[in-house]
Swiss-Prot record:
Keyword flag Membrane: no
Organism: Cyriopagopus hainanus (Chinese bird spider)
Ranges that cross the membrane: none
Subcellular location: Secreted
Tissue expr: Expressed by the venom gland.
Propeptide span(s): 22-50
One MF term in the entry's GO annotations: ion channel inhibitor activity
InterPro entries (alphabetical): Huwentoxin-1, Huwentoxin_CS1
Domain comment (free text): The presence of a 'disulfide through disulfide knot' structurally defines this protein as a knottin.
Keyword Secreted among UniProt keywords: yes
SUPFAM superfamilies: omega toxin-like
Listed name of the protein: Omega-theraphotoxin-Hhn1f 1
Signal sequence, renumbered to the chain: 1-21
Entry-linked Pfam families: Toxin_12
């Protein structure tokens, strides 16, 4: 009878350790996924900034500005060029 109780308690302790380790691994995996998402989002924003300048972004010529924007000659920032097409 004592051995059955001992085996049961040992099994429960082992199960608790395995579940705890699994939970820690799950938390680490979740942290890595969140970090990857944040890094990807940051890289995407930087890529957009490199491709073209948004509204009121600094520029030196029309080619620096995004679609439907033009470089204002006096203030050197991107403004709307008056077009609506997609």
């Amino acid at each position: 009878m004592k051995s059955i109780v001992f085996v049961a308690l040992f099994g429960l302790a082992l199960l608790a350790v395995v579940c705890s380790a699994s939970e820690d691994a799950h938390k680490e995996l979740l942290k890595e996924v969140v970090r990857a998402m944040v890094v990807d989002k940051t890289d995407a924003v930087q890529a957009e900034e490199r491709e073209c300048r948004w509204y009121l972004g600094g520029c030196s010529q029309d080619g620096d500005c995004c679609k439907h924007l033009q470089c204002h000659s006096n203030y050197e920032w991107c403004i709307w060029d008056g077009t609506f097409s997609k």
